[in-house]
């Protein structure tokens, strides 16, 4: 629709030159607005990097020592990106969310450093993490709600910047919970993993959208303009032929001595401004205005209208 509108002139006639500069400016302005919007949205999303956490889990079952290493957690938004290790300790009691201010942790005697394993929900992440820190935890591991599988996200916990806090999935958290409840001594080493930048994906998609819009416009313009040019050329040829035919049907007259048109008080030819003389050939238009044939014919080919009243010779 944008390109079709561009081929019309002010009076509704086809513009043989195709899209006008004003339309190009409007399309360029639209593309500029799109790029500014994408850049602004990119600025808003920038800086939200997500850091994964490698968890090296070690525990003993019978005579076997089992170790699991996986990128199974993410650091909280306000957590220091540091390595931390220790025995995994649960909150005392049946409720594992550590929301009560009276919550304690049963730390094994042989443990120098320990990590609190806490269930998500019931209170803010900040409350859980600060409570564990007050009880002496060196780090906090929070596992997600039941039914969420191993889905994780970077937690928001302002005011807890001095203690490492990571989130793990519910399935992994329940595995650790059951092991510890069965009396298994579990230790975990938390190490900084990789940085993921969602804004980079957003940038790529934004750039792709902008380029796609630009390429689409250029493709449509290039595919459409030759057709418009050919159509306009044919129409111009036909129009010129119609004008020539109409000119040939206009009345001609040779001025003779005594004709009133030769009176010095009469008007001169408004095209060349010369006075009419005997033997001059004049062309009389449908509006009854007349001019030198040699003057008016080129004028009509170019303008199609009477120089005085703008009467169109193609219209009855």
From Swiss-Prot:
Keywords: Glycoprotein, Membrane, Metal-binding, Signal, Transmembrane, Transmembrane helix, Zinc, Zinc-finger. A zinc finger (RING-type) spans 269-310. Its main location: membrane. Gene3D superfamilies: 3.50.30.30, Zinc/RING finger domain, C3HC4 (zinc finger) (3.30.40.10). Disulfide bonds: none annotated. The keyword Protein biosynthesis does not apply. SUPFAM superfamilies: PA domain, RING/U-box. This is RING finger protein 148. Residues 84-178 form the PA domain. Residues 1-12 form the signal peptide. It is a multi-pass membrane protein. It is found in: Membrane. It comes from the Eukaryota. GO terms for cellular component: membrane. The chain crosses the membrane at residues 173-193, 204-224. InterPro entries: PA_dom_sf (IPR046450), PA_domain (IPR003137), RING_finger_E3_ligase (IPR051834), Znf_RING (IPR001841), Znf_RING/FYVE/PHD (IPR013083). It holds the Pfam family zf-RING_2. GO terms for molecular function: zinc ion binding. CDD domains: PA_GRAIL_like, RING-H2_RNF128-like. Glycans are attached at residue 56. Disruption phenotype: Male mutants fecundity is normal.
